[in-house]
């Protein structure tokens, strides 16, 4: 109550809200002692769970942060008065608002005060990842080479480089609270009429006829189980392609037992802001192809972060259902989610599932078909409170812009709320699509500038804060999070070795050495030998059969030496490709590949690359084809192109026989050292080429390294096998075409002479003639 200290506050951090007798409203508060609420998270959790019976004052973590760091009193969402905070803020003696994230000690907690960056797109991406002012972060560790660093926020781990972390100011530095915390119990909430056509007040009056084609978009964050869910939905009824105009993978499939329902697996993203190609592709797919419904998969172990994308998907105003994945982990760790209350607050159906265990998939499909047939759009599109801490400034801003651009948005087939929000963000793609004139653009900029002045913050921070505030309120009412999950505890223990300062690189060498040995020396080599024997037997049988049939020698040679030999040369690579991708899929699904990028980022950054490029180049020592194919997973076009151009410098296993032949001929006394030197020369030349390219064709700032580090998980056998098979099919359909065509061309050149007569002696063939021409320019001059 006003005028009283909350009982959960310690004696040295009493907080009082005196009442103004004339107005009946709170006046500037008094704070005594050190700590002021930041020292201990339970203080604010207790206040959230047991709020004071007072309607005049809204108490929130970020509200108190604003009071302590910006000297403002917030009540009814308005700044009533300026106050001086005499207490030492944030649990540390002396002023500490100049501390940067890159200098935070390991094991310390702090609160984000501000996020700065010259690159507004990068700054928005950082905010979208949850690093908003008022967010508590914990420094987990630094990479073995000192850069990048790993922090924990909003229940997950995030990595970023020191250069980017240096732009993030912190306050409230204190030791991490590792003690157990009691979880408040949540009840159950009845939700009426779900699945009966009356759930959403915005449903269509007439349903789509039974059996009519329906198309779904599957969206979600990275590492939330989206691929596993897609495989459960479609089984083997899927194919892989590209989104138009980009190299981003597109997976389409048909939902099992529902031949009329197809689904597209969109790339894993964290936001619909145009920071990455995947984000642009995902939102353009929804806007342009207008799927009948969106299936949004959420990691139930980290609802807070995942809901950030959910709110943006809801703004697209398409029928939608939420798949709350990994609920088995939540309950196993003592957590709980009031699913009915969650879907009531969001206005969309929520279905708890476990994709890995194939639990709840049938119910999810039923709900998805229902919202698609009845066109049940989200019941809520507005997430900013009119009486929020910013005084409703953002609410008025978005609604004012929405009224101004409504006609343009309808013409451009863009949802009005989504368009208004993106204009506040400064989204150039949406601005161009709306075709606004100069007067309208000036009016919109004036509205946004006025909002920034009233809210006391910039536009990007205001939007991110609005979404996370709504999410925090929702999660506070219907989610009980365990203090620490078993998966996270296990991951921390494993990371002590796999990302440890002195053990990370040796562990990496051991793991990749084992993968290469099993691929090229044991499993892959054995399967390749069996494949070669089988192909040789098929070619011999075909040759004998064609001879017995009396087939023309040229036709027989084309079939045997051209077609079958060409196909065989491709297929002999297949066992290596499958086994290598199988191991890489296991490492990726387990979460280890993200750690490799974290460990190696500092080395590759010197050459203009990020740590994600290390694994494709390493795979290049085994086989260049799968190495180049694996670059498609890199998030940056800059990284993809650079990695593709540098990977061939890593000598693959197919070059080993050639190296052996040349070294044996020219260096008979030192064959092994000569072969090793060829590998080293290739690496050195690749590094030099990277430096040259980074200063010429790919000149510019290095690509930021902002990446989530997921918990270690046991890979799904089904998902891993299907991923390896997809890569194998990709190899067959792409590399096969080139290699097969090259084989046929070589057969033609070595079979015919310049008059297109069949040659008995290949020294008279076209191929020999081309070799003679090359010899003129490559043979040493006579002494």
Where are these regions (language model features)?
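Conserved C-terminal guanine-recognition region of P-loop GTPase G domains, centered on the G4
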Residues: 285-289, 293, 297-349
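Juxtamembrane inter-helical linkers in multi-pass membrane proteins
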Residues: 537, 596-618, 700-722
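Switch I (G2) and immediately adjacent beta-strands of P-loop GTPase domains
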Residues: 243-293
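Transmembrane helix-loop junctions at the membrane interface of multipass transporters and ion channels
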Residues: 653-675
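Alpha-helical membrane segments and immediately flanking helix-loop junctions
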Residues: 608-656, 663
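Conserved small/polar residues in nucleotide/adenosyl-binding loops
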Residues: 777-782
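Conserved G1/Walker A P-loop phosphate-binding module
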Residues: 198-264
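Alpha-helical transmembrane helix bundles of large polytopic membrane transport and channel proteins
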Residues: 321, 331-483
């Amino acid at each position: 109550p006003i005028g009283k200290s909350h009982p959960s506050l310690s004696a040295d951090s009493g907080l009082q809200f005196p009442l103004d007798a004339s107005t009946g409203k709170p006046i500037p508060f008094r704070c005594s002692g050190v700590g002021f609420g930041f020292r201990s998270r339970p203080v604010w959790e207790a206040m959230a769970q047991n709020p004071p019976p007072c309607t005049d004052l809204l108490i929130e973590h970020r509200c108190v942060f604003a009071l302590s760091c910006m000297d403002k009193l917030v009540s009814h969402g308005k700044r009533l008065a300026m106050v001086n905070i005499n207490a030492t803020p944030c649990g540390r003696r002396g002023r500490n608002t100049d501390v940067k994230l890159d200098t935070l000690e390991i094991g310390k907690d702090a609160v984000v005060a501000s996020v700065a960056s010259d690159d507004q797109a990068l700054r928005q991406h950082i905010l979208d990842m949850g690093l908003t002012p008022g967010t508590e972060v914990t420094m987990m560790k630094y990479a073995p080479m000192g850069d990048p660093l790993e922090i924990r926020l909003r229940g997950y781990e995030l990595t970023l480089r020191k250069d980017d972390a240096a732009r993030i100011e912190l306050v409230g530095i204190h030791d991490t609270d590792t003690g157990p915390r009691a979880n408040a119990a949540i009840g159950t909430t009845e939700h009426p009429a779900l699945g009966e056509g009356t759930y959403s007040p915005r449903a269509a009056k007439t349903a789509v006829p039974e059996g009519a084609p329906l198309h779904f978009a599957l969206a979600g964050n990275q590492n939330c189980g989206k691929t596993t869910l897609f495989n459960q939905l479609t089984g083997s009824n899927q194919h892989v392609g590209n989104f138009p105009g980009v190299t981003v993978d597109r997976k389409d499939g048909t939902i099992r037992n529902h031949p009329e329902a197809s689904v597209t697996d969109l790339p894993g993203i964290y936001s619909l802001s145009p920071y990455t190609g995947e984000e642009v592709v995902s939102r353009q797919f929804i806007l342009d192809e207008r799927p009948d419904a969106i299936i949004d998969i959420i990691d139930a172990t980290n609802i807070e972060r995942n809901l950030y994308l959910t709110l943006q998907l809801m703004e697209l105003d398409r029928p939608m259902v939420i798949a709350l994945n990994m609920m088995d982990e939540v309950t196993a760790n003592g957590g709980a989610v009031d699913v009915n209350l969650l879907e009531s607050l969001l206005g969309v159906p929520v279905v708890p599932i476990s994709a890995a265990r194939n639990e709840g998939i049938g119910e999810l499909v039923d709900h998805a078909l229902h919202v698609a047939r009845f066109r049940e759009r989200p019941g809520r599109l507005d997430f900013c409170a009119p009486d929020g801490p910013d005084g409703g400034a953002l609410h008025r801003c978005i609604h004012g812009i929405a009224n101004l651009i409504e006609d343009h948005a309808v013409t451009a087939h863009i949802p009005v709320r989504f368009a208004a929000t993106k204009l506040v963000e400064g989204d150039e793609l949406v601005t161009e699509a709306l075709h606004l004139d100069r007067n309208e653009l000036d009016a919109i900029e004036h509205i946004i500038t006025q909002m920034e002045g009233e809210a006391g913050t910039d536009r990007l921070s205001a939007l991110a804060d609005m979404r996370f505030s709504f999410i925090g309120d929702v999660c506070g009412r219907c989610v009980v999070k365990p203090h620490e999950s078993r998966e996270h505890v296990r991951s921390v223990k494993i990371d002590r070795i796999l990302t440890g300062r002195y053990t990370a690189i040796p562990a990496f060498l051991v793991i990749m050495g084992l993968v290469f040995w099993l691929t090229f020396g044991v499993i892959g080599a054995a399967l390749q030998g069996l494949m070669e024997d089988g192909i040789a037997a098929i070619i011999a049988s075909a040759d004998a059969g064609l001879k017995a049939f009396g087939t023309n020698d040229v036709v027989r040679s084309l079939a045997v030496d051209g077609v079958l030999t060409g196909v065989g040369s491709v297929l002999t690579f297949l066992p290596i490709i499958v086994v290598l991708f199988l191991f890489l899929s296991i490492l990726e699904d387990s979460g280890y590949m993200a750690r490799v990028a974290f460990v190696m980022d500092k080395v590759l950054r010197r050459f203009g690359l990020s740590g994600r490029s290390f694994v494709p180049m390493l795979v290049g020592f085994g086989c260049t084809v799968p190495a180049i194919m694996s670059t498609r997973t890199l998030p940056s076009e800059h990284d993809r192109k650079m990695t593709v151009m540098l990977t061939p410098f890593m000598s693959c296993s197919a070059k080993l026989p050639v190296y052996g032949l040349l070294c044996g001929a020219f260096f008979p006394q030192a064959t092994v050292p000569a072969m090793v030197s060829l590998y080293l020369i290739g690496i050195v030349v690749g590094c030099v080429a990277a430096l040259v390219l980074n200063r010429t064709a790919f000149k510019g700032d290095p690509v930021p390294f902002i990446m989530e580090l997921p918990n270690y998980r046991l890979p799904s056998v089904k998902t891993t096998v299907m991923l390896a098979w997809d890569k194998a099919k990709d190899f067959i359909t792409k590399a096969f075409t080139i290699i097969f065509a090259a084989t046929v061309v070589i057969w033609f050149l070595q079979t015919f002479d310049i008059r297109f007569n069949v040659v008995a002696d290949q020294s008279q063939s076209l191929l020999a003639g081309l070799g003679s021409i090359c010899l003129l320019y490559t043979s040493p001059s006579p002494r």
